[in-house]
């Protein structure tokens, strides 16, 4: 079943519902009503708005006023052809699907997005961890004689020792470092949470660089951001996600690491990976990462074990005749 979509005009276009002409539905009214109905954070609302505008622009440039399920499948294929990652494609399709679900529920329109799946996600992670050697080189490369170096060292050191997400570090305030039972804890607002009700433990090696940085900043007020901008325009303000990513990317590039798979988020992967290599149990690593599902943590363990116990080495040993390096061997080979 097809129907005339809202079009891409501020005045709106007539909408057909089961062959009957309904009232005009202006684009901005529909978008605003849909977005306001979503019980999500402001950043998610903005993502929904951008995603829908992208879809509606795609319809407009093709002169499509009667989209069908095939239209959405074609849109999905177009996203693939444009080289978007499976993660990005899925995000766009989820937004379109939510919008048509809402239109069905609130306007009685046929849901042409029902059953449309996102792109098949690759197994594993989209970012790689740093090696222990790279971590040491990265930290040693930072000149801490000036404030920028003190901040960047404290920040990167915090990431690789605690597994914080970038947004968690950005949201942190000076007052969020508190003592409990003789230990320093950093209370954080975790992913998808409204309060700072999770924490990471700050060892002496993690805490000392932070205090050195804060002292050099002039002992900021408790409610001040833990890590602040040093730009002329926004000096003292909270770092943005973009700025933080740029800082870390720049530090990585300074030691010759320039890969799309090694970014700010890699530091979180690094901490979780190092914890397992250091002997942490799966449950301990899950607590560090604050993974809701232990299966996510198991991916890290699987990757470590897969490399450590790689059967490719046994094949090499067999072909080269070094059978003494192989355990049980089938003598009929």
Feature locations, PLM:
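Conserved catalytic core of the tyrosine transesterase superfamily
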Residues: 2-333
């Amino acid at each position: 079943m097809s129907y005339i979509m809202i079009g891409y005009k501020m005045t709106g276009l007539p909408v057909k519902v089961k062959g009957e002409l309904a009232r005009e539905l202006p684009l901005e009214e529909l978008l605003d009503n849909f977005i306001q109905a979503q019980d999500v954070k402001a950043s998610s609302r903005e993502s929904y708005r951008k995603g829908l505008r992208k879809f509606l622009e795609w319809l407009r440039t093709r002169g499509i006023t009667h989209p069908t399920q095939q239209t959405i499948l074609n849109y999905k294929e177009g996203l693939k052809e444009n080289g978007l990652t499976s993660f990005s494609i899925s995000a766009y399709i989820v937004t379109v699907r939510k919008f048509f679900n809402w239109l069905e529920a609130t306007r009685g329109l046929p849901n042409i997005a029902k059953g449309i799946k996102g792109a098949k996600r690759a197994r594993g992670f989209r970012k790689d961890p740093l090696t222990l050697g790279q971590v040491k080189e990265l930290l040693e490369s930072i000149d801490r004689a000036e404030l920028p170096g003190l901040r960047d060292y404290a920040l990167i050191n915090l990431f690789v020792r605690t597994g914080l997400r970038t947004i968690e570090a950005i949201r942190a305030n000076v007052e969020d470092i508190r003592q409990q039972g003789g230990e320093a804890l950093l209370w954080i607002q975790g992913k998808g949470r409204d309060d700072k009700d999770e924490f990471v433990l700050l060892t002496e090696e993690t805490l000392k660089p932070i205090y050195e940085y804060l002292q050099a900043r002039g002992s900021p007020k408790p409610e001040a951001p833990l890590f602040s901008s040093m730009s002329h325009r926004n000096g003292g303000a909270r770092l943005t996600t973009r700025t933080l990513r740029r800082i870390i990317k720049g530090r990585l590039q300074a030691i010759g690491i320039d890969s799309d798979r090694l970014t700010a988020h890699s530091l979180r992967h690094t901490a979780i990976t190092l914890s397992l290599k250091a002997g942490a149990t799966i449950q301990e690593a899950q607590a560090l990462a604050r993974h809701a599902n232990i299966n996510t943590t198991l991916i890290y363990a699987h990757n470590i074990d897969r490399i450590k116990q790689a059967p490719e080495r046994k094949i090499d040993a067999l072909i080269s005749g070094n059978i003494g390096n192989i355990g049980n061997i089938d003598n009929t080979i």
